[in-house]
């Protein structure tokens, strides 16, 4: 194989690679011999079909397969001989277009290489850890929230008119144009006024109703109502309130905690305190990590492959486009995005540079994700799928190294960050939640924040065509879907009663709901904030495109 370098400019490289026709011919003959035992042809015993007949019948397909493999091997040999580390999938073209049997194979190979990352300066890092003690009032508020979710109702006084929050128990009979319809009649249905569970206007017309009172409710089914025969139609419901109940106050005590499957109130408080502390510790780490990356970015400046920056920018932009579609005014959101296009490109460049830097730090210092850690990641990810699909998901990861790299990358990055935390000089300061959140928000406002993006991060820099959609094979199992909202919540149903309280199961569900949800950042800030949470890893060798030979 002959190699001629045609471009060496910055990180860009280009080569002409010539593979002698004799090498291809020898590979074709070897392939024919290897498949001959499996070829079946009328008139010949199995494995005894002459090579010339095999070539006559299957020659073009064999030559194409051999050519593809020859091109891949040629590119691999080029990368090894020239000691190249591709940033992205090399571009491989046949010089002159189609391959002609009997002639040399001439390839044009173009690529960008990873830069030589300068020795990372990781000595003398100084970080401040902003810590927040779990506030008692926040713990109390979370417990009250749980108590409020465990609603109980007491009998209302005689003559009490139902108001929002009250529970009205109804017998009902619905009709359209005077004709009863299926599912429109029932008894003992409980309706919490103001819950919005029933069709528009139904609950509103129950306000003020008293026990024993009957009313006629005029409503219109929504045009997108699940039962097509009722969609958009006007209906009349004759209802009678058989009972009106008022919310009772849930007393927060040992008995309440025991109803959740706990030993007592002290255990509930400890459980909630632990959840609040976990969330606050996460905020502390987020702030520290961003400050760490700021120092690394400020102390290291080296060229990064434009193709990696462009691919990273494409991902950022796609995420912003997705978020814009959910804004009240998508066009205005897109216009705002366009104003900041250059800023987002700067974010992309920072991501790539930090990714390469963290990857280098991890490799130099022996940071690894162990087989046991990877196994736990796979098991956790598999739980997102239906039980019947979990084995297929695991097989998918085993067959697709890039999918496995995507799964592994965040943990690898966290381990590199933890390594740097251990090396840094860390000072502690106790602050309030508001002060910590304000510090994080100030980071969000800083242009240039971005998740770190390096080789092996799950974005394919050189192992396949880099289109960044990362679509899984057709047989990749689908993730679990949320259960559809039952039709009973859109119209009265005979058996629509409040669910009974759960005991032990409530323990984890209520505790999970007790933790406050993080505030949602505006689209621009969210894109920058998310930046600090992505992966870096070591580069891999790059096979050539299989389709290159056919192009």
Curated annotation (Swiss-Prot):
Pfam name, any one: FKBP_C
Listed InterPro entries: PPIase_dom_sf, PPIase_FKBP_dom, Trig_fac, Trigger_fac_C, Trigger_fac_C_sf, Trigger_fac_ribosome-bd_bac, Trigger_fac_ribosome-bd_sf, Trigger_fact/SurA_dom_sf
Main location: cytoplasm
Name of the gene encoding the protein in the UniProt record: tig
Function description: Involved in protein export. Acts as a chaperone by maintaining the newly synthesized protein in an open conformation. Functions as a peptidyl-prolyl cis-trans isomerase.
Compartments, record wording: Cytoplasm
Domain comment, as recorded: Consists of 3 domains; the N-terminus binds the ribosome, the middle domain has PPIase activity, while the C-terminus has intrinsic chaperone activity on its own.
Enzyme class of the recorded protein, top EC level: isomerase
Similarity section: Belongs to the FKBP-type PPIase family. Tig subfamily.
Biased composition (Basic residues): 542-551
Listed GO CC annotations: cytoplasm
Biased composition (Basic and acidic residues): 458-472
Comp. bias regions, Low complexity: 513-541
HAMAP family referenced in this protein's UniProt entry, alphabetically: Trigger_factor_Tig
Name recorded for this polypeptide: Trigger factor
Catalytic activity of the protein: [protein]-peptidylproline (omega=180) = [protein]-peptidylproline (omega=0)
Assigned keywords, A-Z: Cell cycle, Cell division, Chaperone, Cytoplasm, Isomerase, Rotamase
One record GO biological process: protein unfolding
GO molecular function, one term: ribosome binding
Enzyme Commission designation: 5.2.1.8
Region of interest (Disordered), ranges: 442-551
Domain PPIase FKBP-type: 165-250
């Amino acid at each position: 194989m002959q190699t001629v370098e045609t471009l060496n400019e910055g990180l860009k490289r280009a080569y002409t690679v010539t593979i002698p026709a004799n090498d291809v011919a020898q590979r074709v003959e070897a392939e024919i011999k290897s498949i001959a035992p499996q070829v079946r042809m009328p008139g010949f015993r199995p494995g005894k079909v002459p090579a010339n007949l095999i070539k006559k019948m299957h020659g073009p397909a064999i030559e194409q397969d051999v050519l593809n493999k020859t091109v891949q091997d040629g590119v691999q040999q080029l990368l090894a001989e020239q000691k190249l580390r591709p940033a992205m999938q090399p571009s491989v073209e046949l010089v002159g277009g189609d391959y002609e049997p009997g002639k040399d194979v001439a390839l044009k190979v173009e690529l960008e290489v990873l830069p030589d990352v300068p020795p990372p300066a990781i000595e003398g890092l100084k970080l401040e850890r902003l810590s927040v003690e779990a506030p008692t009032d926040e713990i109390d508020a979370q417990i009250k929230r749980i108590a409020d979710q465990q609603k109980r109702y007491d009998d209302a006084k005689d003559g009490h008119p139902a108001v929002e929050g009250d529970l009205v128990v109804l017998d009902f009979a619905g009709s359209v144009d005077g004709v009863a319809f299926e599912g429109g009649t029932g008894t003992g249905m409980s309706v919490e006024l103001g819950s919005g569970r029933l069709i528009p206007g139904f609950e509103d017309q129950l306000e003020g109703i008293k026990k024993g009172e009957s009313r006629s409710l005029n409503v219109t089914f929504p045009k997108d109502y699940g039962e097509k025969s009722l969609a958009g139609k006007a209906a009349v419901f004759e209802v009678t309130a058989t009972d009106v109940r008022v919310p009772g106050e849930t007393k927060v005590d040992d008995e309440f905690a025991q109803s959740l499957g706990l030993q007592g109130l002290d255990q509930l408080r400890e459980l909630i305190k632990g959840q609040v502390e976990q969330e606050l510790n996460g905020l502390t780490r987020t702030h520290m990590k961003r400050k760490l990356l700021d120092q690394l970015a400020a102390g290291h400046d080296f060229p990064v492959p434009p193709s990696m920056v462009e691919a990273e920018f494409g991902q950022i932009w796609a995420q912003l486009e997705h978020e814009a579609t959910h804004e009240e005014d998508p066009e205005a959101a897109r216009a705002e995005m366009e104003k900041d296009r250059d800023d987002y490109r700067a974010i992309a460049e920072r991501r790539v540079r930090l990714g390469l830097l963290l990857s280098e730090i991890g490799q130099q210092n022996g940071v690894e994700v162990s087989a046991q850690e990877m196994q736990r990641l796979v098991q956790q990810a598999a739980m997102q799928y239906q039980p019947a699909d979990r084995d297929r998901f695991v097989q998918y990861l085993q067959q697709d190294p890039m999918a496995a790299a995507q799964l592994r990358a965040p943990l690898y990055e966290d381990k590199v960050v933890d390594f740097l935390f251990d090396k840094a000089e860390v000072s502690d300061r106790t602050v309030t939640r508001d002060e910590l959140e304000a510090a994080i928000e100030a980071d969000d406002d800083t242009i240039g924040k971005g998740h770190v993006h390096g080789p092996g991060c799950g974005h394919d820099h050189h192992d396949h065509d880099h289109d960044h959609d990362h679509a899984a094979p057709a047989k990749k199992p689908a993730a679990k879907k949320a259960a559809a909202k039952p039709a009973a919540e859109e119209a009265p149903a005979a058996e629509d009663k409040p669910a009974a309280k759960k005991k032990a199961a409530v323990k984890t569900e209520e505790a999970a709901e007790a933790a406050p949800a993080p505030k949602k950042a505006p689209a621009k800030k969210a894109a920058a904030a998310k930046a600090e949470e992505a992966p870096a890893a070591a580069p891999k060798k790059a096979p050539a495109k299989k389709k290159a030979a056919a192009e």
